[in-house]
Amino acid sequence: MFVAMLEWTQCAAVERVPGKVSGAWVFKSTRVPVRALFANLEDGATVNEFLTWFPGVTREEVEAVLEHAERSLTVA
């Protein structure tokens, strides 16, 4: 999975707090790891399903994470 290689400090929708979910990148003000979004999408889930399963995450945050990942992958 490519998520670990991205520079998440520039994405306002996520945070990394020592001691919170073992220091993993999570959606801001939640305990939902960013990797959960990508894992669910890889498994065939839709964004709507993800939002239903993780009600603390907003559509805007998911879109920001996906846009950040896309931009990060297109920068050489």
Regions found by a protein language model. Give the residues of each.
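Long, charge-rich, low-complexity alpha-helical segments
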Residues: V32-A76
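Short, intrinsically disordered or compositionally biased N-terminal tails of bacterial proteins
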Residues: M1-A4
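A short, structured beta-strand/loop element
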Residues: W8-E49
